[in-house]
């Protein structure tokens, strides 16, 4: 007995055994393969095997593999947040600290230079973010000698349509976003940082999930934030700010972004890495 060779053509009227219509393939010699698999002997289709006894299945569960960790904390000191907000808004008027506020090249926002951690008036912010960064490094079994910030900058959004393209932070281990001021515009996307799945191939097939739809099976996640919310994450995790069409009601969106590195050793059995 040999496997038949023949051309297949699409037959939209094909039937499956329970009588429900379903697309299938029909060969030129007249029979339909409902299973979608070319598997027949001597031009005869192979019928699905009948299961005569019910197979009992227990302990069904859904696990999450390869998570991207997001470290979250919050500052509730209103005086501190108000002071940082005032200092950043003051810096927007200084052309030596970043882009000029209201610049026609970017009328929706302002960005400081990435040396904010070197300015005396931001040392308390630097020290706070450095302490939080050290806590994240301590979560891992690194041989840390010192944690330090390589860069730190402020982002200010004034008006609707402000956004920030999806991006990563190369040449860094951990990055963070400190939400100093959050506009009350009634939508999470305008307030927070949106994170994207770093695995493009995972979105090649993306069925609708009607049950249990949450961060673990979504392509993007926009966590709810408040004034003082701090996120830290691996620098390779794509993130950005989605465009908002609503008025900020006079409250600018102010965040401080930063990158954290270490001196010491990330040790594995086969490939230790030394940072100096």
Describe each model-derived feature in a short phrase.
Residues 2-35:
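Arg/Lys-rich, low-complexity, intrinsically disordered basic segments
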